[in-house]
Amino acid sequence: MTVWTLQPVPADGDYLVFGVPYAGTGAASFKAWPRELGAGRFCAVQPPGRENRFGEAHVSSHQEFAEGLVAEIADRLDRPYALIGHCGAVPFLLQIAAHLEERGLPAPRRLFASGWGAPHKGLYGKLNFVDLDEVDMVAEIEERCAALGYRLPPEYLEMAAEILLADVRLQRGYRAEALPSRNVPVSVIGWTEDAVVPQSEVWPGWDECASATYHVLEGDHWEFLRFPRELRDLVEREMTAAIGA
């Protein structure tokens, strides 16, 4: 087991899918995702500064995140694997893949980039374009929880809000300076009812920086976390094709 994954990296399965949580969340955000994905296995990444790593300092850059994760999972990349993430997690996927290639390690067979536009075009989502001193982060957390059908106890709301604020500040500093090569294909995913990063903002420009395919799935911005059948089918189909190639 590594501190960078909530559970041990599975030793079985024909392929692995590593899930990187989006801003303000940790590995527990993947609680609706099964450990088995067809013939493959899913493994949720756990960044520092939250959940079971709450006492640790947050990373200061996307590169630091990539270096920390890769250092711990490098010896487990013994079969085809993918990275998947939603919204603000997407820049981390790109940084991780670029770092893996730079180190000469096995690269992901595919990235699944959900709810985020082309990285070189800038940032996406309202929290990247407002005065953070005037944003009620507690209300943001409550809105997310309500959309997913649960409530956080009051004592956890402030804690979650602080994590979200730290993550958004880091997100705002992202620049697409390290991107993986076109040898790492990207499945870009938009959602029909996404009001945070509308699908019309998701696709334009990806073909300029990646070998990308575009998929539109039914649901709102939070549907990714519910792991609908459409998304599961896409992941299993693409990874089955990857291991057969």
Where would I find each of the regions flagged by the language model?
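Domain-scale detector for complete catalytic domains at protein termini or as standalone homologs
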Residues: 1-84, 91, 95-245
